[in-house]
Amino acid sequence: MRLDTIINHDALCALRELPAESVHCCVTSPPYYALRDYGMDAQIGREDTPEQYIARLVEVFRELKRVLRPDGTFWLNIADTYCGTGSKGAYTDPKNPKGRNGQSLSLARRAAGCKQKDLIGIPWLLAFALRSDGWYLRSAIIWQKDNPMPESVRDRPSRCYENVFLLTKSKSYYYDAAAIAEPIAPTTAARYRGGRSAGHKYDGEVPGQGKVQGINRARTGGYYDEALMPTTRNKRDVWHINTVPYKGGHFAAFPPKLAETCILAGCPKGGVVLDPFFGSGTTGLAAKSLDRHYIGIELNYDYCTLARARIGGETN
């Protein structure tokens, strides 16, 4: 199997050519439903109904499950959309309101049981469909964007997040919590240093770590202080990651930090990271920077060319 390479092909067909249980991790963001037009035959995202869209993705990710190692992880970034007429000015791609190629989109968005202006619920419909297809649904992460795309709506809150689901092939899998651990809050550190009085909520223990001898005594420094006081905590499921402008021709690239976080947690060094919707190659760029191998699959030849130039050093 070739590594550090980009395959210009349909995702499903390309996945069928990969060996079983050959990749450690998948990080991907498939085309969102009815929000943009690649201008390509066989593209995903232009189906007549959400049900058809989800069925196609389930089929692709079923083949991904075959390719993924038993201890592998699958990180899926997906956003929602609204039911509407598809007229100009309706809900558009949160990453690029004018479409991938600068065109204004006018796509009908219809869903069974949904009224015009209803939020369809695409992320959770897909997550539940994947769970029914045998995936373990392990975490629903909120990618919180503190610099979101402005919206002109006045009858609902503006959107500022997308979903990232962690799915796995098995109930036991590779996950490096320490690699993405967060520093504890300054107030928490101060509380540890100062000790606690008897009867405190966490009397004699560090939250999440159980009883620790001497936790109620004030500590003034030295090796005792360092050994006793934790400096990090398990990463929470709300990730504050800003979008990053990209000057290339692919306007829907997610930020490298998002891909890096998933890869650090879900793929060992030297492992193989797969992205079946490679786009401009953010996943490959992140994998390479973290000493992991990558395999990218992308339907659009122009994006393959863009990704190769962006990543550099492709071996195949």
Residue spans for each PLM region:
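Core catalytic lobe of class I
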Residues: 1-316
